[in-house]
């Protein structure tokens, strides 16, 4: 993993400049200080069972040896994820957006989700996030519901993808 450290930290810098908290929680500085330990903690999330968290598998997208995005597959849903987040969440490094990275990450993550035992996966996004809507719909998702979560926030969309035995719709 050390050979991806620099490109990962560059991508992290782009997310920080956008002000995105991203998926790290309090690990932002840890990724810079001890990259190997950070990666080990993310790998351990697949077995994590602490209050408020569900086990998750984290995958990185690489293009030409560069970190271009990440996708997380949550092995199950808790109450919070049923409202916002779903089974899969992804981010594309800002300088790589608009190139199909997120669509491909989701496409490749679906067989992994199936291998983890998921038969159907939930993806949520804001009604104003047209890029994410395209990514989700290109991967065969069906919109089952929309909800107002808060008067000051966009409508939330709830998409489901049924996974075949091969892991892809």
Explain the meaning of each model-derived region.
Residues 1-87, 94, 112, 152-169:
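GNAT-family acyltransferases
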């Amino acid at each position: 993993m050390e050979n991806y450290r620099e490109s990962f930290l560059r991508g992290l810098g782009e997310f920080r400049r956008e002000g995105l908290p991203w998926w790290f929680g309090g690990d932002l500085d840890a990724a810079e200080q001890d990259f190997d330990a950070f990666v080990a903690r993310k790998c351990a999330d697949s077995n994590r069972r602490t209050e408020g968290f569900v086990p998750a598998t984290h995958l990185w997208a690489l293009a030409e040896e560069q970190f271009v995005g990440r996708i997380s597959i949550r092995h199950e849903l808790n109450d919070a994820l049923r409202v916002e987040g779903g089974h899969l969440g992804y981010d594309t490094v800002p300088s790589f957006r608009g190139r199909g990275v997120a669509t491909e990450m989701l496409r490749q993550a679906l067989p992994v989700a199936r291998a983890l035992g998921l038969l159907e996966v939930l993806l949520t996004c804001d009604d104003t996030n047209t890029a994410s809507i395209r990514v989700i719909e290109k991967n065969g998702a069906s919109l089952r519901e929309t909800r107002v979560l808060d008067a000051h926030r966009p409508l939330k969309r709830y998409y489901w993808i049924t996974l075949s035995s091969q892991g892809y719709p």
